Amino acid sequence: MATPSMMPQWSYMHISGQDASEYLSPGLVQFARATETYFSLNNKFRNPTVAPTHDVTTDRSQRLTLRFIPVDREDTAYSYKARFTLAVGDNRVLDMASTYFDIRGVLDRGPTFKPYSGTAYNALAPKGAPNPCEWDEAATALEINLEEEDDDNEDEVDEQAEQQKTHVFGQAPYSGINITKEGIQIGVEGQTPKYADKTFQPEPQIGESQWYETEINHAAGRVLKKTTPMKPCYGSYAKPTNENGGQGILVKQQNGKLESQVEMQFFSTTEATAGNGDNLTPKVVLYSEDVDIETPDTHISYMPTIKEGNSRELMGQQSMPNRPNYIAFRDNFIGLMYYNSTGNMGVLAGQASQLNAVVDLQDRNTELSYQLLLDSIGDRTRYFSMWNQAVDSYDPDVRIIENHGTEDELPNYCFPLGGVINTETLTKVKPKTGQENGWEKDATEFSDKNEIRVGNNFAMEINLNANLWRNFLYSNIALYLPDKLKYSPSNVKISDNPNTYDYMNKRVVAPGLVDCYINLGARWSLDYMDNVNPFNHHRNAGLRYRSMLLGNGRYVPFHIQVPQKFFAIKNLLLLPGSYTYEWNFRKDVNMVLQSSLGNDLRVDGASIKFDSICLYATFFPMAHNTASTLEAMLRNDTNDQSFNDYLSAANMLYPIPANATNVPISIPSRNWAAFRGWAFTRLKTKETPSLGSGYDPYYTYSGSIPYLDGTFYLNHTFKKVAITFDSSVSWPGNDRLLTPNEFEIKRSVDGEGYNVAQCNMTKDWFLVQMLANYNIGYQGFYIPESYKDRMYSFFRNFQPMSRQVVDDTKYKDYQQVGILHQHNNSGFVGYLAPTMREGQAYPANFPYPLIGKTAVDSITQKKFLCDRTLWRIPFSSNFMSMGALTDLGQNLLYANSAHALDMTFEVDPMDEPTLLYVLFEVFDVVRVHRPHRGVIETVYLRTPFSAGNATT
């Protein structure tokens, strides 16, 4: 069909090359020729594919793009349907490959959207440092506790308990001139003292700017009243209530004006007030106020047991940043348009015949096929923002931890700001005149008070490298561990729904599960993490890019361009006629949007609204006689357009119950003449939506969808696959290392040495994958060519690994010490929680040494990961020549007769329901026939599985 006669002829549509005479003025052409030896024009003029130069009578065909407005639209709770009328005039051809939907609307990413790690508010504050605060406490609390058992004094105790007094914990960094009942004096205007404006002064960011200013006689600061809830300083925010930045809550005054209620509290030293003298002078004034305190991006990770209200214990609460949660449209807008759904969610029909050219099948693979197609023709690591192309990825250092320790040979010190601290106040002395050993005060030149440090500089040491590595492990791995390894902090309110952000965000894990000494020196992925989706992570660079394309705010007025992916129409040439084209667009936020935590966006308040959907398309820029020739040719049924789906496969999902290890499947008897082989992987039921319904009410997840986007990560859970046809002939014969009819993928015990590459994959399976992906098998082992080794192929994603662990049977002194009783870095880290350090310095009791002279007995563990790819088993489409290979040739399997197929998969048990995803590779072809104007007929062929027909 792709004959030169149907291509635009260069005589009409030419490429401007060296000779630009066809569109440059004759004078300029003459100048160029006369001066080309010493003045080269080269590409100083545009060098595009230009439009036809003659035989064009309308400008419509010459426009770069045309906009079609929908003639009908239907906006429901779950979807938005747009219908267009495509009018293709005489002597024109519409290029469906160029069409895209231009969609405008409003996106609310919900309150769980957080596009960064850490906090934006007081990020440098210690996690447990409180804000300046006040609370009420019994005046004689200590005595009350001591006397609780004394029945005789019970009445007195009750009386004392009611005597609540306000306690203050604060800071006064601002140094003023004087303190009066008007507050802190900050200057003089003429002869009049100027006092701080209490609505915003003293400002918290202003204090002493010199490190040596230690003696402040008149100080001021701000403090939060006891009616403002106590929160850690880390992450706390209060909105400003005046233009000067003051934050006090506004209260209506008697004059009707809104002002903040700021009260001044004066303090003197305890020594000065002990005598109750008449000459008391305040040293500190605190400006107390109520503010609207909130924590937009942090939460409490440690809360002491308290009653209602503020208390001393609340100064010990600890804050933790909310987990980052990027939210964006999916890669290539997966899930936005309906595919593979019942009821033909898409229509392309000629208005003369009204036959729909879009025949959907439940196993169509439109989205996955498009992902693999893009990978085969381009580089998926290059992002294309127009189609939202930014492939889901993960940080390889997070999936597989190469724990090579920390380079911390030299200690890291921190010093006081002045370099010297803890000085002694000394007075200058001199030898007494006339005495051998006598000394006297030297007050002639020197001050009486001189600050001198005796000894070395004071310093604190911190192991920066080890702390950074430990923090990396906790933030990137520990927080993503399965929920069964986490716990809810005591006294912290948390949601009961495990699919919500509130639940995922507040659950914490013991840092010791993933610490810097775990698997030290090994390249190993945590066993618990192998079955956790690595693409649901804040280091998913593609998702982060797509999220940032929309901006960094919760509410987004978006304007996106969405291409058509359905293989039968995405490359179609629409001949003259009038056509109806409509499609459905989902509004289910869990399907349309993707989040890095995978929380249920429906429950967590996300929403999407479409304001308008238009269609943009282009006509081929052909001269009329070229277009009419092309049309006449395509009307002939011998020149029908036919398209192959890139994946060309029928997919089937088989449920695997939790903890099941055996999955048998059967395919009824059929002719296998055009069969190409199998591809399979494993999916989690939770991560797989029901595509047959427009809105799946049980789909409570918004992370990556391997079923649609190719983010497979459970390939390592397969052990064996057995394939048996109902004939006596063994298939695929004896040309492999292992038993016919059975493919062994991995071996835990490998007595014969069949495994490969320092892991537990068999040589046989490695060869089969190299054959299926790169046709490398009989030629030995070598690295495939770079153009074949694509993102979704086997070799690029194959990750073998091994490690040594203690042999608890051979090592006689082995003790199974639980994590509650393991200590390493004791006294320098929190106990079983990401909280303040506690305990004492002591020799570690974990892990056992695997190196050195005292290395204990160990055994080697091996495994592999192979994400993104599909396991493939190739099959010859010439079924006659399959079977056992002998010197006399291969046995015939009688291609004309039908055979039933039985397959048995042996898998690792998982503690949640999963799905076996099997792709039967067929020939998925559509043939498009346009015999008359406004008539479009399609026939779908899917040998040997099913066929669809749009002409009946």
From Swiss-Prot:
The organism's place on the tree of life at top rank: Viruses
GO cellular component, one term: host cell nucleus
Phosphotyrosine: residues bearing it: 940
BP-aspect Gene Ontology terms: microtubule-dependent intracellular transport of viral material towards nucleus; symbiont entry into host cell
Disordered: region residues: 149-172
Marked site: Involved in interaction with pre-protein VI: 777
InterPro entries associated with the record: Adenovirus_Pll_hexon_C, Adenovirus_Pll_hexon_N, Adenovirus_Pll_hexon_sub2, ADV_hexon, VP_dsDNA_II
Any Pfam family hit: Adeno_hexon_C
SUPFAM superfamilies: Group II dsDNA viruses VP (SSF49749)
Protein induction: Expressed in the late phase of the viral replicative cycle.
Subcellular location(s) of the protein: Virion; Host nucleus
Extent of Acidic residues compositional bias: 149-161
Principal cellular location given in the protein's record: virion
One annotated GO molecular function: structural molecule activity
Chain positions with N-acetylalanine modification: 2
Chain positions found as Phosphoserine: 175
Keywords: Acetylation, Capsid protein, Cytoplasmic inwards viral transport, Host nucleus, Host-virus interaction, Late protein, Microtubular inwards viral transport, Phosphoprotein, T=25 icosahedral capsid protein, Virion, Virus entry into host cell
Family affiliation: Belongs to the adenoviridae hexon protein family.
Known function: Major capsid protein that self-associates to form 240 hexon trimers, each in the shape of a hexagon, building most of the pseudo T=25 capsid. Assembled into trimeric units with the help of the chaperone shutoff protein. Transported by pre-protein VI to the nucleus where it associates with other structural proteins to form an empty capsid. Might be involved, through its interaction with host dyneins, in the intracellular microtubule-dependent transport of incoming viral capsid to the nucleus.
Quaternary structure and partners: Homotrimer. Interacts with the capsid vertex protein; this interaction binds the peripentonal hexons to the neighboring penton base. Interacts with the hexon-linking protein; this interaction tethers the hexons surrounding the penton to those situated in the central plate of the facet. Interacts with the hexon-interlacing protein; this interaction lashes the hexons together. Interacts with host dyneins DYNC1LI1 and DYNC1I2; this interaction might be involved in intracellular microtubule-dependent transport of incoming viral capsid.
Miscellaneous comment: All late proteins expressed from the major late promoter are produced by alternative splicing and alternative polyadenylation of the same gene giving rise to non-overlapping ORFs. A leader sequence is present in the N-terminus of all these mRNAs and is recognized by the viral shutoff protein to provide expression although conventional translation via ribosome scanning from the cap has been shut off in the host cell.
Protein name, per record: Hexon protein
Source species of the chain: Human adenovirus C serotype 5 (HAdV-5)
